[in-house]
Amino acid sequence: LPDGTIYIQKRSDSMLLDPKLGHIHFGFMQFVYENKQWFIDLANQIDDNRKDPITFFGEWCGPGIQKGVGISQIDVKRFFIFAIQIQGESPTWLDFSNIPYKRPNERIWFINMFGKYTLNANFNDAVTLLQQLDAITLAVENECPVAKEFGVSGIGEGVVWSGRDSDGMYIQFKHKGTKHQKPKGPRSSNPDVKIENPNIQKFIDTYFEKYNIYYL
């Protein structure tokens, strides 16, 4: 918040930063408390005259959190930021790849530090789109590029995609590999699906799972 107050949140709950509850969320509360000034400094750098809250979206990863993936084998837990939003009447998503933050933190990383994938998604052609997503996700599932940066070889869970539709609306979803999927509907690389009235959100809700995020 503009006054420096910090809340941590995941999909199921939200709470005020409290070091007495440092053990919750696999130690995420304690981690944020220890790095509180880092987040405040970054928020001030983004907008030191802000009147609205800033939210940092990210994945809390490391030993004891995820199971069976490469990122769970890195030496310590880390927070990987993949989106930043300024709240308010008209929320703004920031291009955080251009934030010239000069105070590095070994346990906080921006996801763009590990490269990215680009795709011109045609939601009118579900079959082709799923095939394109599957090909990229398969490569990540076979070898997690983030874990590899930390000297660990192991499988990846999936890819978080973000972008804008033809109307300029921001969209984001996670496409998981076959080893991590819990299908909500018909799912294969060649699904028999017809979209007469394309609806991106319905498409995502049908074929993809929501990503697990922690944000503050």
Question: What are the residue ranges of the model-derived segments?
Answer:
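Core nucleotide-handling region used for phosphoryl-transfer chemistry
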Residues: 1-216
